[in-house]
């Protein structure tokens, strides 16, 4: 009878190297990615600018995409990140999409984040900016919007399903860079921007951070997730486009073949890419942003251990004094067609037996990655004051590194979210835009403290 003998050399190898191999495997995440094109397949109306009316897009400058990244840590805890080259989606559509994903993949609400780039060169999605768009549409355009919204829902769900099918061992790392084209549009006159920038006299506040998350599989770049706090409003024509963010994603995918580049919009509700209105500028800003991301990738980055925590809360943020039915009746005769449309819609709501709510259920989501990155997802068009406050109070920030990430336009784009300062100053972000979103009045002065108190609670509960 022969016996297999274990050589002394193998024993030395096993004792020396196997523990480290097991440890290395413990340091890996499982990640999956997928992309689905969501460019409308037929001409339809475009979102974001009332001046476009019901005129349809005529061509495609660059395609629009839904993209998904699945993160799974060493304890099999999962998170689903979806990015969309769209202006935004509303609460109802977001809930429907999340419900389907939760049921199919056994997730809870905290594990799904849906982030819109806020491009103003995408299609109108049902439920968003109704007094600006849908309340004025003819039947044909309204049906196109409803059909596209169902197509979008299915596309997102398909994208998530496909990403789950590609889960594989991955390493995660992160860093942060800077890009400087975002400009505070409230405190700088657009025509003076070139001169102010050249003289170093642009007024703030602003947030020029570019957070970057890198996913590698077998040493190859699989996904790049990055954010920036600036409106996607370089373009205002009639071609589908992801604007500067779309160009940035395309350039990164060319630089790193085989990877999926995903953009999320930060707290740039009061930030514009200036100057603008030329395709050349959208390409230039996209290249500027892609270069900032690639510098992070090629520089010093930080590995993330496979630890994931997720939480989600909806907090009631208060409106100011609600209008009476008589006041709405008067507004319904306004020469401002958008104010009149909002008033008629709210009157219909009241007459159907649904009183105007004094609050709105505002979504706040928190992910912690590797016990290093504190990542907040806020709904609506959030002004920059929020990001600066959250980073100041909850992060370790210096000139080269930002470990607190603040995504806006996430899960529900219901309105502008002004800070108390901006609310009291007034103007478009301070309250004027509420008309276009169909909400009954401006926010109460407690809006900022309510949101930031909840942010504080979520980070302290982890």
Segments (PLM) and residue ranges:
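Short linear motifs centered on Gly/Pro in flexible linkers and helix caps
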Residues: 1, 21-22
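Bacterial N-terminal signal peptides that target proteins for export
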Residues: 1-10
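Selective for proline/serine-rich intrinsically disordered segments
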Residues: 5-6, 17, 416, 438
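Bacterial N-terminal signal peptides
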Residues: 9-20
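Conserved beta-alpha junction segments in alpha/beta enzyme cores
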Residues: 25-115, 119-260, 264-272, 277-284, ...
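Anionic-ligand-binding alpha/beta catalytic cores of soluble enzymes and soluble regulatory domains
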Residues: 289
């Amino acid at each position: 009878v022969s016996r297999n003998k274990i050589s002394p050399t193998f024993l030395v190898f096993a004792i020396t190297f196997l523990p480290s191999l097991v440890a290395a495997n413990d340091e890996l995440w499982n990640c999956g990615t997928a992309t689905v094109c969501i460019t409308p397949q037929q001409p339809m109306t475009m979102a974001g600018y009332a001046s476009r009316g019901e005129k349809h897009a005529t061509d495609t400058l660059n395609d629009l995409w839904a993209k998904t990244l699945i993160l799974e840590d060493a304890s099999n805890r999962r998170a689903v990140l979806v990015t969309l080259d769209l202006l935004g989606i509303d609460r109802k559509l977001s809930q429907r999409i999340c419900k389907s994903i939760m049921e199919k993949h056994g997730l809870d609400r905290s594990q799904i984040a849906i982030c819109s780039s806020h491009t103003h060169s995408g299609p109108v999605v049902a439920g968003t900016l109704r007094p600006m768009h849908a309340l004025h549409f003819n039947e044909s355009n309204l049906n196109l919007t409803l059909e596209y919204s169902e197509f979008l829902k299915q596309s997102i769900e398909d994208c998530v399903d496909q990403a789950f099918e590609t889960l594989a061992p991955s390493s995660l790392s992160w860093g942060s860079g800077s890009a400087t084209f975002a400009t505070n549009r409230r405190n700088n006159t657009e025509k003076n921007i070139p001169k102010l920038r050249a003289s170093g006299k642009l007024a703030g506040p602003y947030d020029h951070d570019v957070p970057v998350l890198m996913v590698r599989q077998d040493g190859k770049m699989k996904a790049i997730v990055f954010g920036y706090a600036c409106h996607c409003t370089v373009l205002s024509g009639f071609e589908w486009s992801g604007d500067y963010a779309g160009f940035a994603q395309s350039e990164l995918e060319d630089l790193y073949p085989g990877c999926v580049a995903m953009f999320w919009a930060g707290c740039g509700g009061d930030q514009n890419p200036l100057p603008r209105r030329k395709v050349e500028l959208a390409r230039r800003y996209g290249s500027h942003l892609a270069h900032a991301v690639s510098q992070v990738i090629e520089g010093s980055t930080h590995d993330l251990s496979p630890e994931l925590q997720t939480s989600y809360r909806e907090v009631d943020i208060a409106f100011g004094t609600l209008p009476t039915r008589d006041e709405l009746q008067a507004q319904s005769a306004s020469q401002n067609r958008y104010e009149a449309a909002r008033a008629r819609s709210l009157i219909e709501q009241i007459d159907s037996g649904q009183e105007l709510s004094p609050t709105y259920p505002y979504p706040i989501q928190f992910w912690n990655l590797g016990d290093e990155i504190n990542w907040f997802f806020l709904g609506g068009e959030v002004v920059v004051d929020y990001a600066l406050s959250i980073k100041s109070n909850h992060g370790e920030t210096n000139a080269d590194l930002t470990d607190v990430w603040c995504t806006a336009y996430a899960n529900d784009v219901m309105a502008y979210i002004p800070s108390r300062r901006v609310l009291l100053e007034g103007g478009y972000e301070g309250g004027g835009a509420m008309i276009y979103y169909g909400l009954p009045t401006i926010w109460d002065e407690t809006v900022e403290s309510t949101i930031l108190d909840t942010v504080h609670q979520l980070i302290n509960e982890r």
